[in-house]
Amino acid sequence: MKKTHITEQKFADLDLLPQVIEGLEKKGFDYCTPIQALALPVLLTGQDIAGQAQTGTGKTLAFLTATFNHLLKTPEHEGRKPNQPRAIIMAPTRELAIQIYNDADSLVASTGIKAALAYGGESYDKQLGKIEEGADILIGTTGRIIDFYKQKVFNLNHIQAVVLDEADRMFDLGFIKDIRFLFRRMPEPKDRLNMLFSATLSYRVQELAFEHMHNPEHVVVEPERKTGHRIQEELFYPSNEHKMALLQTLIEEEWPDRAIIFANTKHKCESVWGHLAADGHRVGLLTGDVPQKKREKILEQFTKGDVDLLVATDVAARGLHIPQVTHVFNFDLPDDCEDYVHRIGRTGRAGESGHSISFACEDYAINLPPIEEYIEHAIPMSDYDASALLEDLPAPMRLRTRNPQQRRSNNNGPRNGNRKPNQNRRPRQPRHNKEA
């Protein structure tokens, strides 16, 4: 996956403290993305912002940088105890909260500012212990934050910075009452730095900003199109008979460093997982019934590179923020047009390039016209040579026959023990536009 140039704005040229710049440089960040270049100069003057930017544009680093810098430059309130947060970052999902927390690690190390996590589905006592050790920044989901607040673990009297990430999804998931509950127990908006980020600045999001922020400046980074311009899109029309063989052949040809394969149902995901696992791939499975701890383990394996392929449903994959995903395969075209954009947006993030491959099969080709109407362009189409598809495919594994400790991932041994990359197979035939 190659890195593309982003903007000419260097972090080192902004009014950032040396400790913050050190933390950014440790992560390899030298130049700003467009949302960072627009938002940070505003935030560093102490001005609130309501930012519109798509997932994968670098907004997380923008608000983390501003939050750490603000806390370093602003004296903490007199009488504050170490477990009383100075900043709160609210996310719609626990996966996003965990990702934000992990993204903050280099800034935590370089500044000495402590961060803690609070989200449901994980040990209450473990999170409580971390907060009591000291939590300058509390990152989490609104429900668990409110639980701790009501248990008087901390109060919100010393909040000096607030981040609301993916505000539009907060509305979609019904969390807006929780957000207002927390805002109303913090100091006045003028006495804190407020940051709101959303994929769309709809009327209801702007109303929320007006109600709980202090004259926020709107910062908008419009995508050139709904699907990222760094994502190479490709479409095949496989028969149902060829669909699995085409997927496995393309994986052998592309040999992706890290790929997510989407299917529309839990049953289909399990079937795809079974074929890939039987063929020796290091593959994980995420469906709606995977327990939270197992889910986190699979995501950790995928992020570290112990698992190369992840098969997932849309519901299970919501909130995933995994860096350096090189490929996305739409084994099934989604029923919801927006899900297509969300799926392929897992790759080509924050200046990286990516590749999206979609199958318009006999069952789901009907979903293609509304998707192309929604994204406002036709997906480039490729033909395939059926005679070049893999034929020596083993019978799929079945979940119920596997050891319980291995039920959801197949990551033993070297990568793809049964196969090696083979770019000579060339199942593709010359590409052409559908209009031709």
UniProtKB/Swiss-Prot annotation:
* Domain Helicase C-terminal stretches: 245-390
Cross-referenced InterPro entries, in alphabetical order?
Answer: DEAD/DEAH_box_helicase_dom, DEAD_box_RNA_helicase, Helicase_ATP-bd, Helicase_C-like, P-loop_NTPase, RNA-helicase_DEAD-box_CS, RNA_helicase_ATP-dep_RhlB, RNA_helicase_DEAD_Q_motif
Q: Does the keyword Cytoplasm apply?
A: yes
Q: Name one GO cellular component term.
A: cytosol
GO BP annotations listed: RNA catabolic process
Occurrences of domain Helicase ATP-binding (ranges): 40-219
Broad class of where this protein is predominantly found:
cytoplasm
Disordered: region residues: 398-436
Question: Residue numbers of motif DEAD box?
Answer: 165-168
HAMAP family, alphabetized: DEAD_helicase_RhlB (MF_00661)
Q: What is this protein called?
A: ATP-dependent RNA helicase RhlB
Give me the gene this protein comes from. Answer: rhlB
